[in-house]
Amino acid sequence: MADDWEFAADSKVVVKPNAANNINKWEGEDDDEDVKESWEDEEEKKDEEKPTKTEAPAKTKPNKVLKAKLLEQECLEKEEEAKRLANMSTEEKLAEKLRLQKIQEESDLKSALETFGLTSIDGGLDSFNPQSNEEFKEFGATLSWKIAQYKESPHFPQFIEDLVQALCVNLSTADLKKVKMSVEVLHSEKLKMEKVSVKNKGAAKNRGKATLRTENDDIDVYQKYGDDFTDDYDDFM
């Protein structure tokens, strides 16, 4: 028995590995991952190849009800304004006309100021603060435009005379002389224009008289010829 144990100890025990144990349990995982990745790549390519559909913006339909209400409100406002004007007295209508005229004048003044490159008219003419020569020209042009709106008034000439006197009081004698010369030049030009106008009117009247005189001359010649014939007949008798 002891010999058997010695023999068993001396002999090498060879353990054969199990074939199943040699199989890598992770084997095939890489293949599955490769297949999965290739499948995902194909799906991504298909998604990229698909044409993207752009959604058309939803068309906003006009609110017909709102438009109808606004139109109705506008018509009512016009009717109320017409009734208000119809119930006005003559004095109230005149005041309303002057008010609208003032609004129009302010609008025209604003356009004139914008023409000169001025946008601020909060204070009207008082907003001007001219410093340079160009600014004084703009101020003078605007002021002249404003005053000229009342040129049809019978009080306008006297107003201008008083205004010029009031303004010239602050001038020196040298500057006042310049103003006087400018006014005299303007007066001379006005006289020439009036003479030309009167001359043209006179020429037009003379042309009309010449035509009338020619017709009368024909009648006079006929009458003279008739008188001569009568005289010759009397002499013959």
UniProtKB/Swiss-Prot annotation:
Residues 28-46 have a biased composition (Acidic residues). Keywords: Coiled coil, Cytoplasm, Initiation factor, Protein biosynthesis. Residues 20-64 are annotated as: Disordered. It holds the Pfam family eIF3_subunit. GO terms for biological process: formation of cytoplasmic translation initiation complex; regulation of translational initiation. Its main location: cytoplasm. The gene is eIF3j. HAMAP family: eIF3j (MF_03009). Component of the eukaryotic translation initiation factor 3 (eIF-3) complex, which is involved in protein synthesis of a specialized repertoire of mRNAs and, together with other initiation factors, stimulates binding of mRNA and methionyl-tRNAi to the 40S ribosome. The eIF-3 complex specifically targets and initiates translation of a subset of mRNAs involved in cell proliferation. Component of the eukaryotic translation initiation factor 3 (eIF-3) complex. The eIF-3 complex interacts with pix. This is Eukaryotic translation initiation factor 3 subunit J. Belongs to the eIF-3 subunit J family.
